């Protein structure tokens, strides 16, 4: 099985970006 480091890095980056973005939205909406 070949592990694609670049794909894993992009996946992790998108997860972190989406998570932090949702936290910002939650913070602004007061939830």
From Swiss-Prot:
Source species: Cuscuta gronovii (Common dodder)
> What's the protein's topology in the membrane?
Single-pass membrane protein
* TM region(s), chain numbering: 5-25
Query: Which Gene Ontology biological process is one annotated for this entry?
Result: photosynthesis
How is the subunit organization of this protein annotated in UniProt? The 4 large subunits of the cytochrome b6-f complex are cytochrome b6, subunit IV (17 kDa polypeptide, PetD), cytochrome f and the Rieske protein, while the 4 small subunits are PetG, PetL, PetM and PetN. The complex functions as a dimer.
Output the Gene Ontology terms for molecular function: electron transporter, transferring electrons within cytochrome b6/f complex of photosystem II activity
The answer to whether keyword Endoplasmic reticulum applies is no
- What's the protein name? Cytochrome b6-f complex subunit 8
Question: Does Transmembrane appear among the keywords?
Answer: yes
């Amino acid at each position: 099985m070949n592990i694609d480091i670049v794909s894993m890095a992009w996946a992790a980056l998108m997860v972190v970006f989406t998570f932090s973005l949702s936290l910002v939205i939650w913070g602004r909406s007061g939830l």
